[in-house]
């Protein structure tokens, strides 16, 4: 150590007791008690009470936790569907940025694009895991949730498009009495009822009935219409191990279809085109009629705590006129 630094060292040693004396009252002070922080969580069984869902059946052969599913799955719960007042699938899927409209004109059935790939009307749409005809606007009044599997889905649906699969889960028997009446700024009138319950000597039979009528008032001129819907879900707990479930739903809709604009080689959008005008409208033309019937049944037997077997069948029919 050089001679020039020795006075500074001695000065530092003299200040050390003073620093310890100043710090000693702080060390002797009472510890500070912080307020407790409460962290509340919920189980997967309770997660369907809001917009979050913890389980889905579209990712495999049975319902499974989303955390344990090695796939990208979006689940839209009953609460979300109800709060959005969704009546079409497009009202639900707009919450997912990976989904776009493939061809979804007013008054016709919708088709969608997932991650840039169009869904196939033959096998990309399902109810309770069973394939349905995709050329229909499936009603949402009797749906518990809508599940979207994004990506390859050959394991779930065989030959399918790489975009994914959309699965509707129907409501099951529950003690419920509900009536919904609504309207909007266009003068649309909507009425729906939801009734269900259990009955029998051992409460082994369950029913869920949904009815709806809608007077459609479109923002497009001359594109009004109407829709009627009815569904029935039946549950039979044959024994502690055996369960039978049956579902049937019918819908009839009439509305003029609104064709889109095509540029046909042009590079600029037309300035006088109005989205409220129905192209090619004739007062003698008839609206597009779509009549759909979807039925499915499932028998399930629990062999033991680890093994379960099921047998299911379905039928879907759509008539477009």
Q: What are the residue ranges of the model-derived segments?
A:
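Cleavable N-terminal targeting peptides that direct proteins into the secretory/outer-membrane pathway or into
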Residues: 1-33
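Outer-membrane beta-barrel proteins
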Residues: 2-3, 30-31, 91, 103, ...
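Acidic, small-polar-rich N-terminal luminal/periplasmic segments of exported/outer-membrane proteins
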Residues: 35-176
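Structural signature of outer-membrane beta-barrel domains
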Residues: 44-46, 98, 119, 132, ...
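Short acidic, glycine/serine/threonine-rich loops at helix termini
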Residues: 48-52, 220-221, 257-260
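Short sequence motifs at beta-strands and strand-loop junctions characteristic
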Residues: 73, 106, 184-187, 222-226, ...
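Outer-membrane beta-barrel translocator/receptor signature
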Residues: 141-144, 155-232, 236-244
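Acidic/polar loop-and-plug regions of large Gram-negative outer-membrane beta-barrel proteins
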Residues: 214-218, 231-237, 241-302, 306-321
């Amino acid at each position: 150590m050089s001679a020039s630094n020795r006075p500074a060292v001695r000065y530092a040693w003299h200040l050390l007791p003073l620093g310890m004396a100043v710090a000693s009252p702080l060390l002797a002070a009472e510890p500070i008690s912080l307020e407790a922080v409460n962290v509340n969580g919920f189980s997967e069984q309770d997660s369907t009470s809001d917009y979050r869902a913890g389980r889905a059946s579209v990712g495999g052969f049975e319902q499974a936790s989303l955390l344990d599913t090695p796939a990208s799955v979006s689940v839209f719960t009953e609460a979300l569907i109800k709060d959005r007042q969704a009546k079409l699938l497009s009202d639900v899927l707009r919450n997912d940025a990976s989904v776009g409209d493939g061809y979804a004109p007013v008054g016709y059935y919708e088709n969608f694009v997932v991650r840039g790939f169009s869904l196939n009307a033959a096998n990309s749409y399902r109810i309770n895991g069973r394939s349905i005809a995709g050329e229909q606007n499936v009603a949402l009044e009797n749906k518990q949730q809508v599940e979207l599997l994004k990506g390859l889905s050959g394991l779930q649906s065989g030959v399918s498009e790489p975009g994914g699969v959309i699965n509707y889960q129907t409501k099951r028997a529950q003690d419920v009495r509900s009536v919904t009446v609504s309207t909007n700024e266009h003068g649309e009138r909507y009425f729906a009822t939801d009734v269900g319950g259990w009955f029998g000597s051992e409460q082994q039979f369950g029913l869920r009935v949904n009815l709806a009528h809608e007077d459609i008032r479109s923002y497009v001129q001359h594109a009004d219409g109407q829709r009627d819907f009815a569904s029935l879900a039946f549950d039979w707990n044959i024994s502690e191990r055996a369960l039978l479930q049956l579902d049937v739903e019918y819908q009839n809709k009439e509305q003029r279809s609104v064709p889109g604009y095509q540029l046909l080689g042009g590079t600029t959008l037309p300035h006088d085109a109005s989205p409220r005008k129905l192209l090619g409208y004739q007062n003698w033309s008839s609206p597009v009629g779509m009549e759909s019937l979807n039925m499915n049944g499932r028998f399930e037997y629990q062999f033991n705590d680890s093994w379960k077997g099921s047998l299911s069948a379905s039928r879907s029919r759509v008539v477009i006129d």
